[in-house]
Amino acid sequence: MKIGTSAMSPSKTHFTTIDEYIQSFPPMVQERLHQLRQTIKDVAPDAEEAIKYQMPTFVLYGNLVYFAAWKRHISLYPITAEMEASLQELADYTTSGKGTVQFPNDRPLPLPLIRTIVACRVRENRANKEKAT
C-alpha cells in the first residue's frame, strides 16, 4: 500500500481537503479524526491545514504533523528520536523508526500526549526556522 493511502479509506485516494479525507471514513473513525484534528489546532492555532502525501497535514514553520487512519489505528507523524527518548508515555504505543506513533482504535486517543507531541514539534520547527535565518 503506498504511503498516505489509508487501509480503511474508500476508493478515493486523491483528497484536496482534510474534511474530504475525514468524511471518507466510517463514523467512529471520523469522530476520532475530528478529535485529533481539533487537538492539533488547539495547540497550534496558527498552523495551516493541507493535504500532503494524501494525508492531513498541519504546516507551521514547515511541515508540523501528519496523520492517517488505518484499519486498526490512527498514525501520527513525525515522532522524532528526541521525543521517543524523552516522552515516557510513548512506551504505551507502537512506534516505528520512521517517526510514527500508532494509536489503536480500541483505546481512547491520548489527548495529553498528542498535545505534548504537537507542542514539541512547534518548538522544533520554530528552532529550525530560527537557525536557518
Positions of PLM-derived features:
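Charge-dense, helix-prone N-terminal extensions
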Residues: 1-133
